[in-house]
């Protein structure tokens, strides 16, 4: 669960950065 949450957070950050 922790790993998944961390990965999701990183992906969300990348998406925001791309925007």
Swiss-Prot record:
Keywords: Adaptive immunity, Blood coagulation, Coiled coil, Disulfide bond, Hemostasis, Immunity, Innate immunity, Secreted, Sulfation. The modification Sulfotyrosine is found at residue 4. GO terms for cellular component: extracellular region. It is found in: Secreted. The keyword Secreted applies. The keyword Secreted applies. Conversion of fibrinogen to fibrin is triggered by thrombin, which cleaves fibrinopeptides A and B from alpha and beta chains, and thus exposes the N-terminal polymerization sites responsible for the formation of the soft clot. It comes from the Eukaryota. One of its GO terms (biological process) is blood coagulation. Cleaved by the protease thrombin to yield monomers which, together with fibrinogen alpha (FGA) and fibrinogen gamma (FGG), polymerize to form an insoluble fibrin matrix. Fibrin has a major function in hemostasis as one of the primary components of blood clots. In addition, functions during the early stages of wound repair to stabilize the lesion and guide cell migration during re-epithelialization. Was originally thought to be essential for platelet aggregation, based on in vitro studies using anticoagulated blood. A long coiled coil structure formed by 3 polypeptide chains connects the central nodule to the C-terminal domains (distal nodules). The long C-terminal ends of the alpha chains fold back, contributing a fourth strand to the coiled coil structure. Heterohexamer; disulfide linked. Contains 2 sets of 3 non-identical chains (alpha, beta and gamma). The 2 heterotrimers are in head to head conformation with the N-termini in a small central domain. This is Fibrinogen beta chain. It comes from Tapirus terrestris (Lowland tapir).
């Amino acid at each position: 669960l922790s790993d998944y949450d961390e990965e999701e957070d990183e992906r969300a950050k990348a998406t925001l950065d791309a925007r």
